């Protein structure tokens, strides 16, 4: 904010994307609004997404800014996914880490629109899931036990369970189609 020479009172929106929020309640975006010293008129929103989270967050932020009612917005994306994996799960550690980004977006009259292709397919939820710890399956003594899972790896029901092949297959089949759909929508040849 300082490097941009932005007045904190001009920031009208803060979106926080994470699957590892500070608390169940309140929303982390509200806490960040306060910690950053943004005014109480700042629109805040939490989005719970992983890999696609930055793109989804940017699409929401750009939509909020597109009419010029909000002039400046922040997109904060961060996860501490190392806390979600079991230290004994050798399939998890090479793929996940802790990271965060901050993206500042400003409305400029006459600037080009931002275009996105977003889609959702919840049918593969079992391919990457933390079975216990939320409201469908709360925390119990059974949740804490580290056991050998059906895939032969050690983890508790509070750790991320991932079918790497299913996640990989999803990524390599869906991502290219999403890019192609966006290019088609914008009438840009794929060769370009």
Residue ranges and their predicted role:
Residues 19-73:
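Conserved catalytic cysteine-centered active-site region
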Residues 66-99:
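Flexible, glycine-rich active-site loops centered on histidine and acidic residues
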